[in-house]
Regions:
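Active-site HxH/HxHxD metal-binding segment of metal-dependent hydrolases
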Residues: 1-70, 161-162
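Metallo-beta-lactamase
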Residues: 56-57, 70, 77-163
């Protein structure tokens, strides 16, 4: 998910469930067919591309990451949480020391995309229930502004209420 610039990075970590997309992206599996249009390019007139020429470049993962893996960045240690639902290889990153959650696309304070071709509501529910149990203080979602752990629990409870799942 959100991989249009992944080829720019020397290191590309991904969950195995989405590794093939990085290696062989196309308009369907990247959602570019549905979400990328000429208006995006017209907003940047210096850009020499147009929609008809746009392609997400292939660049395979350099490392596969699984639930429970630890990413030690020196001053920050993040635990990988596999949080499928929005997409099958969705991950969140949990920093226990600061009680900070980088939730990606599974949760943010705005309309959640849960009906893409690769979304799965049962997985979504399981992932949200798992996140709700964490002692989160701050959430940095994949979209919109960051929010508190209390707001996270409110958003998750509202999602379950709206879907009548418990």
């Amino acid at each position: 998910d959100h991989i249009a610039g992944h080829h720019e990075f020397d290191e590309r970590l991904v969950h195995p469930a989405e590794a093939e997309i990085l290696a062989a992206p196309d308009g369907a599996n990247t959602l570019a067919t549905d979400f990328v249009g000429d208006d995006m390019f017209e907003a940047h007139p210096d850009c020499p591309l147009c929609y008809a020429e746009y392609r997400v470049r292939a660049a395979p993962a350099t490392r596969l990451i699984e639930d429970g893996d630890v990413l030690d960045l020196g001053n920050r240690v993040l635990q990988v949480l596999h949080t499928p639902g929005h997409s099958p290889g969705g991950i969140s990153l949990w920093e226990a020391r600061t009680q900070t959650l980088f939730s990606g696309d599974i949760l943010y304070d705005g309309p959640l995309i849960e009906d893409a071709y690769h979304s799965n509501l049962e997985d979504y529910a399981h992932s949200l229930a798992r996140l709700r149990e964490l002692p989160v203080r701050t959430v940095h979602g994949g979209h919109f502004a960051s929010f508190s752990g209390q707001r996270m629990r409110e958003l998750i409870d509202a999602w379950f209420d709206a879907h009548r799942l418990t």
